[in-house]
Amino acid sequence: PVDKRALIADLKERIAGGEPGNAGLPGAISLGTGINEALPDGGLRKGALHEIAASAYRDMGAATGFLAALAVCAMKDSSRPVLWCEAWRPPFDMGRLHGPGIAAFGLDPARLLLAAPPGDSDCLWVMEEALRSRAFAFVAGEVDGRSSALSLAATRRLQRAAEETQTPVLLFTGHAKGSASVAVTRWHVAGAESRNILYADEMERLPGCPRWDISLA
């Protein structure tokens, strides 16, 4: 005779597993419906180096926001903090991370550790050591994509450390064209118009959630 309970349980598992965007695979962080399906690992691979670049200088803020969104996804997958490392340089018009702003974005400032080493090579070193410490859910770093410090060997070290610790590492290279790298994914990000929210009382259109125009290499 057929065990109906076991059959129903099996069907439930199959249905749940077939729902798009339900979750990433065990070795990946879920990024939601659509994006998960476009990635070979069913999400953002944990033990890997990923690169983000702005499509143009005007998209630097949008790319930073996208990086923050990925950090939010990583925080949902782990109770550990996130390291955000940027080589110190004058912020000019791009500014720096702002606590209340990132909190409104969904990134808990209490779980975010900011580091500002003096140069790009120092930033890469801090990122590698942070990965090897196994203390973080996610390691992010901002390095000038034109820097000589961002060599193929440097990306190999980050990739190796990420694999050994199964910790995702995101490298934001600004708006410069990417150099040789072993990054598993390379994201090019541009800002996109948000969907307006209709304000019922006054029938006004309010700014909606952030959106991005993304290409993946």
Language model features with spans:
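Detector for small/aliphatic-rich hydrophobic stretches
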Residues: 1-83, 101, 105-110
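Hydrophobic/basic alpha-helical segments enriched in Actinobacteria
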Residues: 27-28, 41-44, 92, 119, ...
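Helical mechanochemical/support elements of P-loop NTPase systems and associated helical scaffolds
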Residues: 31, 63, 94, 123, ...
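Residue-level signal for short, function-critical loop segments
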Residues: 55-56, 86-88, 175
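Arginine/glycine-rich "motif VI" loop of SF2 helicases in the C-terminal RecA-like domain
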Residues: 75, 106-107, 160-167, 207
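Conserved inter-motif catalytic segment of the P-loop NTP-binding fold
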Residues: 80-138, 142
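P-loop NTPase motor core
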Residues: 116-191
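Phosphate-binding/switch region of NTP-binding enzymes
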Residues: 171-217
